[in-house]
Amino acid sequence: MSSLRLLISDSYDPWFNLAVEECIFRQMSPNQRVLFLWRNADTVVIGRAQNPWKECNTRRMEQDGVKLARRSSGGGAVFHDLGNTCFTFMAGKPGYDKTISTQIILNALASLGIQATASGRNDLVVINGEDERKVSGSAYKETKDRGFHHGTLLLNADLSRLADYLNPDPKKLQAKGITSVRSRVTNLVELLPGIDHGKIRTAIEQAFFAYYDEQVSAEVISPQSLPNLPGFTEQFAKQSSWEWNFGQAPAFSHVVDTRFIWGGIELHFDVLHGAIDRCQIFTDSLNPTPLEALAQRLQGAAYRPDAIDKICQHWIDDFPELQTELQQACHWLVEVLR
């Protein structure tokens, strides 16, 4: 039996790809060396310990249909589109060594005429003009008997969109968790016009085979053609769930405020595991009672616009004589929390 395994995903769904990655990692033989190549359509991928409300412009993402995906490894937030090629190297210990997988990527780039170097713990950089620019970022995960190294290569990504989704709204947000470090980046197409996913994928495959002096046939996987992956359905459900992608956020506080004709309101939220642990409302309204009632209702609710909207609608029903004013407040609150 070969010690190598090559998997290619035909899916652009980040939740599918991350679920496949996790299942293969858990079930692989400790003596195997696995290469998994994949791409995600418009997605912000965050590290295991990150806070999406701190890292991302969640409102803009929802408007533009950009998915949020939390990975099981550490590190920072990145934007993926089809101009990125994603790679995952997996191996059992003691064979797992992230310097080997880094070298395979460097060898693949060199075979295409691109001279890149490793920088720090996670990045690959190239010289573009007089500047050093990042073309690849990575993250890692290790267990007792195995490990994986995964990352992205910027081929022809829409770099203008990085600022759209990776700069959060200017909210009064105080949060714990790991903050992403923004780097100067460039696309490989700037160095090698005509490079595309097919070419870089082939180069990585050939560098993988050359390093281990062995070749295997690729296993192409998609939602219609899955390998035998026990537990995949459950893992996909987890990867695609609000509870994993948002609810795993570290504790944070969020303050929002606005002013209506009938008075100003300021809400202070303490959020723990994606739920409102504490809510305080301050107002100069002549009738603060409805807003005080809302603060009580929001306690324990999921910190998500649809859940808060549902609570607000029931709250409005309790004060029919103030329906217009409270609808204004509800609409504002749901929108500001997107």
From Swiss-Prot:
Domain BPL/LPL catalytic: 29-216
Subunit text: Monomer.
Sequence similarity: Belongs to the LplA family.
Keywords tagged on the record: ATP-binding, Cytoplasm, Ligase, Nucleotide-binding
HAMAP family: LplA
Top-rank taxon, per record: Bacteria
GO CC, one annotated term: cytosol
Amino acids binding ATP: 71, 76-79, 134
Entry's localization field: Cytoplasm
Pathway(s) served: Protein modification; protein lipoylation via exogenous pathway; protein N(6)-(lipoyl)lysine from lipoate: step 1/2; Protein modification; protein lipoylation via exogenous pathway; protein N(6)-(lipoyl)lysine from lipoate: step 2/2
E.C. number(s) listed in UniProt: 6.3.1.20
GO MF: ATP binding; lipoate-protein ligase activity; lipoyltransferase activity
Note: In the transfer reaction, the free carboxyl group of lipoic acid is attached via an amide linkage to the epsilon-amino group of a specific lysine residue of lipoyl domains of lipoate-dependent enzymes.
Function: Catalyzes both the ATP-dependent activation of exogenously supplied lipoate to lipoyl-AMP and the transfer of the activated lipoyl onto the lipoyl domains of lipoate-dependent enzymes.
PROSITE patterns documented for this protein: BPL_LPL_CATALYTIC
Protein name, per record: Lipoate-protein ligase A
Single GO BP term: protein modification process
Lineage: Bacteria, Pseudomonadati, Pseudomonadota, Gammaproteobacteria, Enterobacterales
Binding site for (R)-lipoate: 134
A Pfam match: LplA-B_cat
Record organism: Yersinia pestis
Signal peptide per UniProt: none
Main subcellular localisation: cytoplasm
Catalytic activity reported: L-lysyl-[lipoyl-carrier protein] + (R)-lipoate + ATP = N(6)-[(R)-lipoyl]-L-lysyl-[lipoyl-carrier protein] + AMP + diphosphate + H(+)
